[in-house]
């Protein structure tokens, strides 16, 4: 299975409860950013620049857990910054496991090997390592030599210890797709559990020269989709069709709400117009109708999984052929 049975069961149960209750807008994945400090300055990441004035702020553990409880999403993505720099990261993960949340611990992998002792393998924890190319390319994007080798060493140690590990690859304008194919087969050969791939987001604070426009995304993902059946790709087939320009999907910005030291980030993980103090305020005060392709120019080229995979989850039960395609894909 592409995803563990326990995760499929949790999501199905959660979706059923939301639909029975009549809720139209509800979160699927909480993006929890306990800090924005990082040990790298990656070329495609706008987080450090966006939160430069508060880069040293760290979220107290009890505040992080309150956000998890207030949101109620069945999945929590612990990100940043580099979450392995967060001092109580072991306690945070343990508390999330105790709450039976499915966790994606997102890391650049530099500190992974030495941090494994803080965690224990279990069905709720997935370690998600960013890898944007083979060694030379990935080190260049990361701004430091040796990053790729450290990440791979950490991945191998984590898999040997029994942890579930997946990777996340951002695709840029200059990405060499044959190199990405080589990377994905390399990851499969070291027994990775899954691979995510998505076009990098065009942050306002970064140079737009490195990012894909919509047409370029279609071309790049035609190739990635063509190799996906041979690999443990976790991007859903409906999302891949969207990336190829073969399927229309509307963004679901509330599907992956973000909480950090400034509060609840509105409207989405990628765009910041304001921060709200409470989750309820985020959901009720954000004018969701203002955002999306053709509505806000910042959304023009965005095809990120954080906005569109939640749409797939919301839509899949409405069409039998989509539902069956997802079932077959998940079991292959």
Each predicted region: which residue ranges?
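Conserved alpha-helical substructure of the radical SAM core
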Residues: 2-118, 122-123, 315, 325, ...
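Flexible, active-site-proximal loop/turn residues at the rims of small-molecule/cofactor binding pockets
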Residues: 51, 82, 133, 201, ...
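Accessory C-terminal segments flanking Radical SAM cores
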Residues: 232-332
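Conserved residues at the C-terminal ends of beta-strands
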Residues: 48, 79, 130, 198, ...
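Generic structural signal for helix capping and beta-alpha/helix-loop junctions
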Residues: 52, 113, 136, 175, ...
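Radical SAM enzyme [4Fe-4S]-AdoMet core and its adjacent flexible, acidic
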Residues: 59, 125, 130-132, 140-256, ...
